[in-house]
Amino acid sequence: MSEFKRLMRLKLKMKQKRPEFKRQDWFKCSRIGTSWRRPFGKHSGMRIGLTHRAAVVNTGYRGPVLVRGLHPSGLQDILVNNVKELVALNPEVQGARIAATVGKRKRIEIVKKANELGIRVFNVSKQKQEEFLSL
């Protein structure tokens, strides 16, 4: 377990050091936006990797394989649409994220059942959970 915690700490440190990858010349016109696109220009300093240019996406920025894609709490993030899907989760290694398409009535049912089973719900705040449990 200590190895897992070490890797989670390493993942956090790597995330803090990871630069914000932005599209080349994103600041020149707002129309193109900032979302990442690989630079292909023949004379592109960013593509060549000049030090005074923005960082380019590389495999070296990835986190450790064993903890890649996990929630910062260390649990696997599982999308849940109903109570049946929630019951199938393992509370020790998995946490629930309620889908955006789920309505309030079913959301309340899912939160109550998750509390019963000891499953963590990532996208419902503590105050909302208390409010739902009191209904």
From Swiss-Prot:
The keyword rRNA-binding does not apply. GO terms for cellular component: cytosolic large ribosomal subunit. GO terms for biological process: translation. One of its GO terms (molecular function) is structural constituent of ribosome. Keywords: Ribonucleoprotein, Ribosomal protein. PROSITE patterns: RIBOSOMAL_L32E (PS00580). It comes from the Archaea. NCBIfam families: PRK08562.1 (NF006332). PANTHER family: 60S RIBOSOMAL PROTEIN L32 AND DNA-DIRECTED RNA POLYMERASE II, SUBUNIT N (PTHR23413), RIBOSOMAL PROTEIN L32 (PTHR23413:SF1). Belongs to the eukaryotic ribosomal protein eL32 family. This is Large ribosomal subunit protein eL32. It comes from Methanococcus maripaludis (strain DSM 14266 / JCM 13030 / NBRC 101832 / S2 / LL). The lineage of its organism: Archaea, Methanobacteriati, Methanobacteriota, Methanomada group, Methanococci.
